Amino acid sequence: MGTVLSLSPSYRKATLFEDGAATVGHYTAVQNSKNAKDKNLKRHSIISVLPWKRIVAVSAKKKNSKKAQPNSSYQSNIAHLNNENLKKSLSCANLSTFAQPPPAQPPAPPASQLSGSQTGVSSSVKKAPHPAITSAGTPKRVIVQASTSELLRCLGEFLCRRCYRLKHLSPTDPVLWLRSVDRSLLLQGWQDQGFITPANVVFLYMLCRDVISSEVGSDHELQAVLLTCLYLSYSYMGNEISYPLKPFLVESCKEAFWDRCLSVINLMSSKMLQINADPHYFTQVFSDLKNESGQEDKKRLLLGLDR
């Protein structure tokens, strides 16, 4: 009917036991092969990363070298140009020194001229005089000093000589007229300090010298003209914008006062500007005013000699 194949259980167990080592070895072999594949994959990934880093580093170095090359070439060009310019400057300096030879010294005189006492012949060599250091174009600096009272006295003496018809006029009278006006303006508050200073007296003298005539017939006329010149001096040299007319008026008619002011301005406008712009002109007028007292002393000396 059929055959029955029977296997003994001991044999099967034996075979399983006998093959047990082989199956474990096969399992370990499979596991080792898997691990080897994983290790190979890891090694490949590490190997692939390392060359990429090296490539990036190499490319960065190349870029830096490319950037550094133009700078280095530029610096080398600058250094080369500097060297060339230095060589040219040295050559030009050598040429300039060569083109300018040292000045030739004059020949020494012969021994016969030097020993003039022995041969009886005097030496003909003479030293030229040294030129003056100061140039003739620059004007000399003149320093003139005087006090206010001294200049006022000189002004009074000048007015007494100019107005020779006024027999009773003394040098102190014009000074008193000027002082009274200055004091009244101080008391009324029109000025903070006195106007009568050496510079302002010099300015007033410049006006009086050209304005006041020698044909003045009275003290009142002289006072009117003198105070007109003083008002213009205040207006031109004073610190305030305007001053009142009352201290300067000695007559009731203001039109006559303004007419005199206009005539003085038309006559002395250029000199009034010059005395402030030109210090030499101011010094000259200052010296002229100071010399007015010396003329009075000379006149008195001549009168004493005539007697």
UniProtKB/Swiss-Prot annotation:
Subunit details: Heterodimer composed of a catalytic subunit CDK5 and a regulatory subunit CDK5R1 (p25) and macromolecular complex composed of at least CDK5, CDK5R1 (p35) and CDK5RAP1 or CDK5RAP2 or CDK5RAP3. Only the heterodimer shows kinase activity. Interacts with EPHA4 and NGEF; may mediate the activation of NGEF by EPHA4. Interacts with RASGRF2. The complex p35/CDK5 interacts with CLOCK.
UniProt function note: p35 is a neuron specific activator of CDK5. The complex p35/CDK5 is required for neurite outgrowth and cortical lamination. Involved in dendritic spine morphogenesis by mediating the EFNA1-EPHA4 signaling. Activator of TPKII. The complex p35/CDK5 participates in the regulation of the circadian clock by modulating the function of CLOCK protein: phosphorylates CLOCK at 'Thr-451' and 'Thr-461' and regulates the transcriptional activity of the CLOCK-BMAL1 heterodimer in association with altered stability and subcellular distribution.
Pfam family, one: CDK5_activator
Keywords, comma-separated and alphabetical: Biological rhythms, Cell membrane, Cell projection, Cytoplasm, Lipoprotein, Membrane, Myristate, Nucleus, Phosphoprotein, Ubl conjugation
Biased composition (Pro residues): 100-110
Protein name per its UniProtKB record: Cyclin-dependent kinase 5 activator 1
Residue numbers carrying Phosphothreonine: 138
GO molecular function, a single term: calcium ion binding
This protein's record includes keyword Disulfide bond: no
Highest taxon listed in the record's lineage: Eukaryota
Organs and tissues of expression: Brain and neuron specific.
Stored Gene3D superfamilies: Cyclin-like
Family: Belongs to the cyclin-dependent kinase 5 activator family.
Species per Swiss-Prot/TrEMBL record: Rattus norvegicus (Rat)
N-myristoyl glycine lipid attachment residues: 2
Annotated stretches, region: Disordered: 97-133
